[in-house]
């Protein structure tokens, strides 16, 4: 991470890292495997905690803390504690903004349905598991045929849920060539999973 790299560059600098969520570092590619039951112990998904980050890198990690404003003149940030809603100011010499990414949610009707989920972090994973346990779905649709999409497809299938995978492109795993993707398509269908993707043009 940037904080760990900053520590390697300076052993004496005071480094503070603010994280809006509860978790610092986790195995995001492992999230579907916990949903599917292959990884039973949820704690194995955690790569670093605030305590381990402090012990290893001497970095002050403050989770559940959201930076709500930046004052470049005074070189301070206003931080909101999301547990008690109190706000305080913290000074800085150098400020690095690394807010991360968010899933692309297509603007389609029904996307706000509570049974519709995205998977980016551990809270997302927990919500999906709760939905499965509470609603006992017979069918699940996965939108997106990248790494996480394929892993989620497999997770639902392993839980005995009839699964459909939808990919906007003309193949899953667009990072591989069409011949390799063809083998993946064949295996998906051999597992009894419905695969839908854009039909290739006659020139392809």
Model regions and ranges:
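Secondary-structure boundary motif
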Residues: 8, 12, 55, 130-137, ...
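Glycine-rich Rossmann-fold phosphate-binding loop(s) that bind the pyrophosphate
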Residues: 145-146
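FAD-binding core/adjacent interface of flavoenzyme oxidoreductases
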Residues: 51-140, 199
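Helical element adjacent to the flavin cofactor pocket in flavoenzyme catalytic cores
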Residues: 184-193
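Amphipathic alpha-helical segments in well-structured domains
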Residues: 125, 180-181
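Beta1-alpha1 glycine-rich phosphate/pyrophosphate-binding loop at the start
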Residues: 1-61, 153-179
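Conserved small/polar residues in nucleotide/adenosyl-binding loops
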Residues: 197-204
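N-terminal Rossmann-fold NAD(P) dinucleotide-binding loop
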Residues: 149
């Amino acid at each position: 991470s940037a904080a760990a790299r900053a520590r390697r560059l300076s052993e004496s600098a005071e480094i503070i890292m603010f994280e809006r969520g509860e978790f610092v570092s986790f195995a995001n590619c492992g999230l579907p495997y916990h949903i599917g039951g292959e990884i039973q112990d949820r704690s194995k998904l955690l790569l670093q905690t605030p305590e381990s980050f402090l012990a290893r890198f001497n970095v002050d990690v403050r989770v559940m803390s959201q930076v709500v404003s930046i004052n470049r003149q005074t070189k301070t940030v206003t931080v909101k504690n999301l547990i008690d809603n109190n706000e305080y100011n913290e000074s800085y010499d150098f400020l690095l903004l690394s807010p991360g990414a968010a899933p692309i949610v297509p603007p389609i009707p029904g996307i706000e349905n509570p049974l519709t989920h995205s998977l980016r972090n551990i809270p997302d994973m927990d919500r999906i598991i709760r939905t499965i346990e509470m609603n006992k779905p017979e069918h699940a649709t996965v939108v997106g045929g990248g790494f996480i999409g394929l892993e989620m497809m497999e997770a639902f299938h392993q839980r005995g849920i009839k699964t459909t995978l939808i990919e906007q492109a003309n193949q899953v795993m667009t990072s591989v060539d069409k011949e390799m993707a063809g083998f993946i398509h064949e295996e998906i269908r051999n597992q009894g999973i419905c695969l839908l993707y854009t039909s290739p043009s006659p020139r392809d």
